[in-house]
């Protein structure tokens, strides 16, 4: 019994030690959740995207900001968090519930919430307590404007099935970009300036 307790204690220490302290957003669990959320979004497909071509719109995904080198190290975590929070907010609405299979939608919202909780666990550790006011950060404002454009589009289209299908495809792009950012952070140990 003492051996088992020692082993468990060692595992806890390793997970909170230098190797495990790269920040919760770099965890393997977060990457698995991200892949599962993309898989769920793919399964939510109800219409052929080709039948909705007339409703296409360029929402202006700040892809080069998320996937490129435009983000500073201290901006990457807040941008990732904001992308996930806005995605959750989009799918956790009454209009969304009416548009999608509720089982898949609930699983997606649960997965996004899990990612947010994982990120929130070390929010202060990664950003510093003094940096927690992020509303004025330019990249965050860019992400918020991007999602506001999606909300405006859905409202303009009367939350039609085709509008939701276009948004579903767009959200796959957005979450793929955020996953790319997570991978970059994982490869560099949180330092975006590393080669």
Swiss-Prot record:
The keyword Acetylation does not apply. Disulfide bonds join 24-122, 52-162. Paracrine hormone primarily responsible for maternal recognition of pregnancy. Interacts with endometrial receptors, probably type I interferon receptors, and blocks estrogen receptor expression, preventing the estrogen-induced increase in oxytocin receptor expression in the endometrium. This results in the suppression of the pulsatile endometrial release of the luteolytic hormone prostaglandin F2-alpha, hindering the regression of the corpus luteum (luteolysis) and therefore a return to ovarian cyclicity. CDD domains: IFab. Coiled coil: none annotated. Gene3D superfamilies: 1.20.1250.10. Transmembrane segments: none annotated. Belongs to the alpha/beta interferon family. IFN-alphaII subfamily. GO terms for biological process: defense response to virus; female pregnancy. IFN-tau genes are intronless. They evolved from IFN-omega genes in the ruminantia suborder and have continued to duplicate independently in different lineages of the ruminantia. They code for proteins very similar in sequence but with different biological potency and pattern of expression. This is Interferon tau-8. One of its GO terms (cellular component) is extracellular space. One of its GO terms (molecular function) is cytokine activity. The gene is IFNT8. Pfam families: Interferon.
């Amino acid at each position: 019994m003492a051996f088992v307790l020692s082993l468990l204690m060692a595992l806890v220490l390793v997970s909170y030690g230098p190797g495990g302290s790269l920040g919760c957003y770099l965890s393997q669990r977060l990457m698995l959740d991200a892949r599962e959320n993309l898989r769920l979004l793919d399964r939510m497909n109800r219409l052929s995207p080709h039948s909705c071509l007339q409703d296409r719109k360029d929402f202006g995904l700040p892809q080069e900001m998320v996937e490129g080198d435009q983000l500073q190290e201290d901006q990457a975590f807040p941008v990732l968090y904001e992308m996930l929070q806005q995605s959750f907010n989009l799918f956790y609405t009454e209009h969304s519930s009416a548009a999608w299979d509720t089982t898949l939608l609930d699983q997606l919202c649960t997965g996004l919430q899990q990612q947010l909780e994982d990120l929130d666990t070390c929010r202060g550790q990664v950003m510093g307590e003094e940096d927690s006011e992020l509303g004025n950060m330019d990249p965050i404002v860019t992400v918020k404007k991007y999602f506001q454009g999606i909300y405006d589009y859905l409202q303009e289209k009367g939350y039609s099935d085709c509008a939701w299908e276009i948004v579903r495809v767009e959200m796959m792009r957005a979450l793929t970009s955020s996953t790319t950012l997570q991978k970059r952070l994982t490869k560099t140990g949180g330092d975006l300036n590393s080669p």
